[in-house]
Amino acid sequence: MDKRSYATVEKYAAPFVQIVLEKNQQRDVFRELSQIKGIFEETYLADFLSHIGVSQAEKSKVLRLFQTCDSVLVNNLIEVLIKNGREDFFYPILLDILKKIEKETNEFEVTIHSVEGLSEEQKARLIPVIEKKMNLKVRSIKENLDRSLIGGFAITANHKIIDTSIKRQLKAVKEKLK
């Protein structure tokens, strides 16, 4: 993304996040935008909206389909983008808003990489440890099964990693033996 595009994204995302936080609607807005993000990822809608061959009317029509959200703030954001002809920036703005809300609230999705799936009890026991060690709040847990870890688990959130896997421990031993 070039500087001009980034400035446009910031122009819409920063004030929107500020309003969301002032109205204490960060959970609802985050949930709505996460659902929209999922739809965009499944359908490659961002490519459609940024395609030069698609008319503004078509882009507006597609974005208006998302105005059925429960959140008035999200509906208003979509309306402002349509009125200003910025439909092609909706997806980058959405991503930036999600990042800013996470950063401001310090609530993140945590990804747990493990050989086997964790039980609900194990997840419940891990949440306080994760929150304390990583100094953040857990919004949700995403599991990723990875047989290459051999045993243990690795946790990632907000660009931080806790790795207790046997694979990492074996690498550490290998490095010491060199």
UniProtKB/Swiss-Prot annotation:
Its main location: membrane. Keywords: ATP synthesis, Cell membrane, CF(1), Hydrogen ion transport, Ion transport, Membrane, Transport. GO terms for cellular component: plasma membrane; proton-transporting ATP synthase complex. It is a peripheral membrane protein. One of its GO terms (molecular function) is proton-transporting ATP synthase activity, rotational mechanism. F-type ATPases have 2 components, F(1) - the catalytic core - and F(0) - the membrane proton channel. F(1) has five subunits: alpha(3), beta(3), gamma(1), delta(1), epsilon(1). F(0) has three main subunits: a(1), b(2) and c(10-14). The alpha and beta chains form an alternating ring which encloses part of the gamma chain. F(1) is attached to F(0) by a central stalk formed by the gamma and epsilon chains, while a peripheral stalk is formed by the delta and b chains. F(1)F(0) ATP synthase produces ATP from ADP in the presence of a proton or sodium gradient. F-type ATPases consist of two structural domains, F(1) containing the extramembraneous catalytic core and F(0) containing the membrane proton channel, linked together by a central stalk and a peripheral stalk. During catalysis, ATP synthesis in the catalytic domain of F(1) is coupled via a rotary mechanism of the central stalk subunits to proton translocation. This is ATP synthase subunit delta. It comes from Streptococcus gordonii (strain Challis / ATCC 35105 / BCRC 15272 / CH1 / DL1 / V288).
